[in-house]
Amino acid sequence: MAAKKTVTKADLVDQVAQATGLKKKDVKAMVDALLAKVEEALANGSKVQLTGFGTFEVRKRKARTGVKPGTKEKIKIPATQYPAFKPGKALKDKVKK
């Protein structure tokens, strides 16, 4: 069984351009604009919900105490925020097949 290929942004641009008949540069501009708007919304604390696909959101990780592996010294790990994706039902169902 061959390994699955990673699909890059350039691959997606090529595939969308082929499927729609639009020029690659126009599709790339749209993809870049979409991703920039998702980043902007997340940076502003908003969720981005794409019905049937999923939701992008910022989640919070609480502060906690950790241990440095080399010295076994206890360290404080500060609270952080990180981007997360929760797949929608339609995407989950598609992947299960």
Curated annotation (Swiss-Prot):
Self-association and partners: Has been isolated in complexes with 5S rRNA and bL25, and with 5S rRNA, bL25 and uL5. Homodimer.
Coiled-coil ranges from the UniProt annotation: none
Role: Histone-like DNA-binding protein which is capable of wrapping DNA to stabilize it, and thus to prevent its denaturation under extreme environmental conditions.
Domain of life: Bacteria
Name of the protein in question: DNA-binding protein HU
Lineage of producing organism: Bacteria, Thermotogati, Deinococcota, Deinococci, Thermales
GO BP annotations, alphabetical order: chromosome condensation
Species of origin: Thermus thermophilus (strain ATCC 27634 / DSM 579 / HB8)
Family in the record: Belongs to the bacterial histone-like protein family.
PANTHER family given in the database record: DNA-BINDING PROTEIN HU, DNA-BINDING PROTEIN HU-BETA
Entry GO terms, CC: cytosol
InterPro entries: Hist_DNA-bd, Histone-like_DNA-bd_CS, IHF-like_DNA-bd_dom_sf
Pfam families reported for this sequence: Bac_DNA_binding (PF00216)
GO molecular function terms listed in the Swiss-Prot or TrEMBL record: DNA binding; structural constituent of chromatin
Keyword Heme: no
